[in-house]
Amino acid sequence: MMAAVSGALALCQCSSEAPPPPGTVRMVDQQAIALMQEARAKEARNDLSGAIKKYRRVVEKHPLSREAPQARFRMAELYEARKEPAEAFDQYQKLIDRHPDSPLYRQAMSRQKEMAFGAASGALTNRVLWMFDVRMDPTNVTEWLKHVRDNAPYASTAPQAMNVLGNYLAARGRMKEAIEAYQNLVDNYPNSPLAPTAQLQIATLYRQAAADGDRNHVNVARAQEAYEDYLQRYPNSARAGAARADLAAMKRELVAQQLEVAEYYLTKMKDADAAVFCYQEVASKGSINPAAAARAKARLKELRVTSR
């Protein structure tokens, strides 16, 4: 009987990293307290590796103790001190997931925000081979910023994280992913002060894609749509005038592309009927692109077709 009880107690003490029910805490755990004291003693001797091992033992073997979130938080801090930010961020995340009632919960989220934003700006680095500090891997940065959003989706930090992510990806030429980040901000946080700029960034990225050689009709059309959305949502914003000018430029570009299509049908495909249809479309848009409309009318005259 005593053996069975002892075995049950041992099972209670020896837990894996499997998370306990969120908010579960054991009132007093003397073994956890002793391990915390041992960890602090190692810290006092500047044995950070040894201290981390003791703190890890607390969270692995005594996950229900009051000391578990303290150990988790301190372990994360020590990883930061050792220039191991990925390990630190992971420990903060586990604290957030497993100890939402801990007084350290908000501090952990705050540290994650600082780390994620610092990694995106390049201020936070990762130490390699014990001596070289290098920028964080883009995969880490992207995941971290999404964690910041997801951990507090209704806080102001969520749209901030998406804005930082969009800027980070755009600076690296990852246009599609950057647009997705900005779109997430605009769709889910329309009242954020960052939303107008994010909407304008979407339009700008599509326009840049068109200007950089990818004159795909879809990119130009999406840029036009993004500018229209911006002006519809924020007609009185400080940048509305510039957005209207950019929108007009996109409309002119679309008409110019229609003219190119008409020329292609006429000169390459030898399809006069299709060419005439396109020329008539362009000719009707003189208020948007006068030069293209004039060219289309001249072509229609050559083809002896009356413009609409």
Give the residues covered by each predicted segment.
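Acidic, polar-rich low-complexity tracts and alpha-helical solenoid repeat scaffolds
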Residues: 11-308
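Bacterial N-terminal signal peptides
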Residues: 1-10
